[in-house]
């Protein structure tokens, strides 16, 4: 039996009110972040005195301000940033502000309605509704950052919403909304944010591994794969070796083709970067190398990627 028009109206009104209530629950903890030209981004009061936002929206390290729910604009200091997970942490001093209720992205299901919430200096609170379009397991970004869960959202991400909270139907913050590749919208899950925030507050940075090599993808001809009995179609060819860097000290040469790291095949530079997470710094990695048409093994002691400006 089909629903009557009045029943459908009542259902839609109830859904609309519930979503508005979800926005209202987080609204007082959402701030506008002024750290780039023209359009501000958003952030959320994650814990006492700590604002979390997207690193990609932080275009300067000084003269940062945030606009609160009551309209006040106050200074904020950059406590730390991690481009690999797209998380930046700002600190506030002597500011009373409600803390958002933090949930878990693991509670989400494909098809669940979610809301990207933000704040701008001009229009105040704003939101965009969408649905969870894809979920997955843990993954590494192209810069080596470990993300605990893959969460893709189908919604319109206006510039003022970037870096703001993604909330579920209960108004709980389940992640930070960021721009993904090819105009996708992703959420950095709350578990990842908690881990990154704790490390940034303690150390101001997160170590990332590097091997001091400039590389680019290369395709291997079938004849060579057959001769060397290789399963992979390609690897990464070394086009630059940083003097006295980890690769140089291990004896890697320009023209070497890296085929695998610790037994895991690599086919592009993103594969290599993704395997050099914080846990790799200071540890050796076994690299299968093709040199002069022959295979050899090289052990590289992974170094720490220099910070920006170093």
Give each language-model segment a name.
Residues 37-40, 60-61, 158-162, 235, ...:
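Short, small/polar residue-rich loop motifs at catalytic or cofactor-binding pockets
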Residues 60-78, 95, 109-116, 125-140, ...:
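Beta-strand/loop subdomains of soluble extracytoplasmic proteins
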Residues 27-29, 93-101, 126-182, 190-195, ...:
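Active-site region of chymotrypsin-like
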Residues 11-22, 29-48, 54, 72-75, ...:
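A conserved glycine-rich beta-strand in the N-terminal activation segment of trypsin-fold
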Residues 30-34, 51-55, 108-120, 153-156, ...:
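Active-site-proximal beta-strands of protease catalytic cores
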Residues 38, 48, 59, 81-85, ...:
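Short, conserved beta-turn/loop elements at beta-strand boundaries and strand-helix junctions
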Residues 1-2, 36-40, 46-87, 92-95:
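Catalytic-histidine neighborhood of serine endopeptidases
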């Amino acid at each position: 039996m089909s629903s009557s028009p009045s029943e459908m109206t009542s259902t839609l009104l109830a859904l609309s009110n519930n979503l508005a209530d979800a926005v209202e629950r987080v609204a007082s903890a959402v701030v506008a972040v002024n750290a780039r030209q023209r359009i501000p981004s958003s952030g959320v009061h994650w814990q006492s005195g700590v604002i979390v936002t997207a690193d990609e929206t932080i275009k300067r390290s000084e003269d940062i301000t945030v606009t609160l729910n009551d309209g006040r604009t106050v200074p904020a200091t950059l406590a730390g940033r991690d481009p690999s997970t797209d998380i930046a942490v700002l600190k506030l001093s002597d500011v009373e502000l409600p803390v958002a209720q933090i949930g878990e992205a693991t509670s989400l299901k494909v098809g669940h309605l979610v809301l990207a919430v933000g704040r701008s200096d001009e229009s105040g609170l704003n939101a965009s509704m969408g649905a969870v379009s894809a979920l997955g397991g843990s993954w590494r970004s192209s810069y080596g950052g470990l993300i605990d869960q893959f969460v893709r959202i189908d919604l319109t991400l206006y510039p003022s919403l970037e870096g703001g909270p993604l909330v579920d139907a209960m108004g709980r913050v389940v992640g930070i909304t960021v721009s993904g590749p090819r105009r996708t919208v992703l959420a950095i899950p709350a578990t990842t944010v908690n881990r990154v925030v704790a490390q940034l507050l303690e150390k101001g940075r997160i170590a990332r591994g590097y091997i001091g090599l400039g590389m680019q993808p290369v395709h291997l001809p079938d004849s060579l794969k057959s001769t060397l009995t290789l399963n992979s179609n390609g690897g990464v060819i070394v086009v630059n070796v940083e003097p006295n860097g980890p690769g140089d000290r291990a004896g890697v040469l320009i023209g070497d083709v890296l085929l695998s790291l610790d037994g895991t095949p690599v086919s592009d530079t993103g594969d290599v970067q993704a395997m050099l997470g914080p846990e790799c710094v200071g540890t050796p990695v076994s690299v299968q190398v093709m040199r002069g048409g022959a295979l050899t093994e090289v052990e590289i002691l992974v170094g720490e990627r220099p910070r920006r400006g170093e």
